[in-house]
Amino acid sequence: MQTIRNVHVRRVAAPIERVRPWIETCWSGGDRDCFPRDVIADWRKNPPGADPLALIPGETLVGHGPFRFRLRAWDGVVWRVDVVGSRGGWHGFHLQPDGDGCRVTHTVELESTLSARLGWMAIEPIHDWAVEALFDRLEHALRTGVVPERTERPMSRVAAFALGLARGARSRRPKARPSAPMGW
């Protein structure tokens, strides 16, 4: 079976040792999270009793929008999560030395079923914007020591339209009815 593969690469002017902590805090929802969380909410969840910011292979769940991922590996160079749910695949980062800087590669690979291809066509513009925005925010954090509060990268009309459709579809889902009070 063929796979859907999407790759983004950015060279940053900092060595791996300085990039690594920023990758570790992605999808944490905190102020050191480089994901464009001011536009698309993200989160991280660990088992009860574990440090909420820990990265525990096989246990840590991360996500954004309707997407959930389980951490497979993080060794300080390769950060990889598996897609949770009906779509098989993974995404992750690979850090490589590049002179006095670091090359950051973000890759997504998904099973190429018909439904996956159709779904990917809808979300690819949003995904591409989010990865490039994350890279922008990472570079800002490396320069200043702080992740910007607002994501400055403009969103293409196609990505904005797709994000609006995704948000509208989510808001139109039927809400669960509250259970009836006792005595009814």
Segments (PLM) and residue ranges:
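Hydrophobic ligand-binding cavity/cleft-lining segments
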Residues: 1-52, 160-184
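Hydrophobic-ligand binding "helix-grip"
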Residues: 57-105, 109-113, 168-184
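A conserved amphipathic terminal alpha-helix motif
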Residues: 110-177
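Short, low-complexity, polar/charged sequence segments that are solvent-exposed and flexible
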Residues: 27-31, 90, 99-100, 123-128
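Hydrophobic pocket/interface hotspot
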Residues: 19-29, 71, 79, 104-106, ...
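Glycine-rich loops and low-complexity Gly/Arg-rich segments
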Residues: 32-37, 95-97, 106-108, 128-133
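Short acidic, gly/pro-rich beta-turn/loop elements at beta-sheet edges
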Residues: 20, 31, 91-93, 114-116
